[in-house]
Curated annotation (Swiss-Prot):
GO function term, MF aspect, one: 2-oxoglutarate-dependent dioxygenase activity
Domain JmjC as annotated: residue spans: 305-448
Name used for this protein in its record: JmjC domain-containing protein D
Spans traversing the lipid bilayer: none
InterPro entries: Cupin_8, JmjC_dom
UniProt superkingdom: Eukaryota
Amino acid sequence: MDYYQSELIKLFQKSNEIYKDNNFETKLNEKNYKFLLVYLNSIHSILKIDMKLNIYQYINIEFKELILISKELMKIVFDIIHSGTWNNIDILFKDLFAYSSILYIYSFFLIQFKNIKVDNNNNNNININIPNPIKKIILKKLDLALIFGDKLFNQVINQIINLISNNNNNNNNNFLNNFKNENYNNNNENEIILNKEKLIKRISRPPSLNEFKNEYMIKGNPCVIENLMKEWPCFNERNWSDLNYLKNVAGSRLVPIEIGPNYLHEKMKQKLINFNKFIDEYIISKNSDDDNDDIGYLAQTKLFEQIPQLRNDILIPEYCKIKIGCGDDDNDNNKEDNVEINAWLGPKGTVTPLHYDPKHNFLCQIVGRKYIKLFSPKESNNLYPHLNSKLFFNTSMVDVENPDHSKFPLFKNCDYIELILNAGEILYIPPTYWHFVKSLSQSFSIFP
């Protein structure tokens, strides 16, 4: 047995241990989903896996039947997790989708091993040569598992991806030579004249944790923090302003994007797309004269759980770990691993409608510039939220750029503050503070 097979089997064994340790069978029985156990038991029976035994001895079993069963299981669980509102779907089924994807990939791999070569180079490193058609199928299935699954199997899935991508080092230079040096085109940015009496407070010297907590978080005062991000790798040796770098790291991966003027628009839709294709079609080729109905952007996605290499390019501001509330221990801040990080990447002209979020927000601008207009929670009654909507109750009905004052008369006298957020700056937005955002250029931001 070669190195590649043995490493894959170890990861598969690890996923089975996770399955057992988290009592999937008991939970499925309790939720009256016993029919799913029929599929799972059939899969384990084909593999003849007893969790107490070593699965190495079963390497030569015929796995075609396993592929059919695991594929059917994936389809059934996929339908379950898309049968209702995403946030209300039981995490158990999201985890089960990820596990069934691992089962499918494992059986698929073992059938395809005859097409996979493993070479040792002079440095005793392992080069795994997987034909591109096979690699595309594998990466697509694993990306779907990361996108639609929960976090339980993420580490195993990313380790499998790293294993099959282990031969990238020798191919990176050839890959980069296949396209011209491409970067964001931000030469034609919109110029916005700000009201000097409505400017947000800017902090050039990052405050201490206690100072920031007491003066901004507890009091609910938004601000812009400057000079805090300049040491991040994404501004230096792994620069995100270089699209070649982003393509090299994530080019072959499948990512979810949104297409349309904004999330309230009737033509709004979602799409899964190859990252390279997204960059070429929606970032590089996009200009301000294009139809906004076809504008595409990557928004509020768990990109860094899916592609940990990009996660290593950023740092989490210590302010994000401050706890606010009764009984909180100032010395017991949240661990960095528990901080949820969303990514936003899109072209010039994209708009996020006026809305509020229930938690503390830190908008970290990495590439490009954004115009942002903020309204205090005290103005909520004058901002006309969608009160009758379960999805958009936190979003205003007012078009901030072209308000209809006859329909929304109270909006005209609302107090506000505004700013242009530049690359390298962090905007702190307190909970329930209303904010409208528009990209003045092609833009990459994160929200820890």
